[in-house]
UniProtKB/Swiss-Prot annotation:
One of its GO terms (molecular function) is structural constituent of ribosome. Pfam families: Ribosomal_S18. Belongs to the bacterial ribosomal protein bS18 family. Gene3D superfamilies: Ribosomal protein S18 (4.10.640.10). The lineage of its organism: Bacteria, Pseudomonadati, Spirochaetota, Spirochaetia, Spirochaetales. InterPro entries: Ribosomal_bS18, Ribosomal_bS18_CS, Ribosomal_bS18_sf. GO terms for biological process: translation. GO terms for cellular component: cytosolic small ribosomal subunit. It comes from the Bacteria. Transmembrane segments: none annotated. This is Small ribosomal subunit protein bS18. Binds as a heterodimer with protein bS6 to the central domain of the 16S rRNA, where it helps stabilize the platform of the 30S subunit.
Length: 96
């Protein structure tokens, strides 16, 4: 049923790599981001507007969690607290 093929013929590929994968020189290893709120055991609060400034862009937009590394639970809470701080005029809606 199966042909008897020696291991050298099975492992050799046409591209010259034994494992069959081409090496990508542009590949970069990214460190997984961790949630700052989970690490420090703190909850986002609108009164800490200096800390909340780290999570908004220069234009005043809320940064997504794939960039900040926050968990889904804390990202939802963070968005609410930023909106509260904007309403209380602690953070600007739009930066000029």
């Amino acid at each position: 049923m199966y042909k008897d093929v020696d291991s050298h013929q099975r492992d050799s590929r046409s591209d010259g790599h034994q494992d069959g994968f081409k090496k990508n020189p542009n590949f970069r290893f990214f460190k997984k981001k961790t949630c700052k709120f989970c690490d420090m055991d703190r909850v986002p609060d609108y009164k800490e507007f200096d800390f909340l400034k780290k999570f908004i862009t220069e234009q005043g937009k809320i940064l997504p969690r794939r960039i900040t590394g926050t968990s889904a639970k804390h990202q939802r809470r963070l968005a609410l607290e930023i909106k509260k701080a904007r309403y209380m005029a602690l953070l600007p809606f739009v930066k000029q």
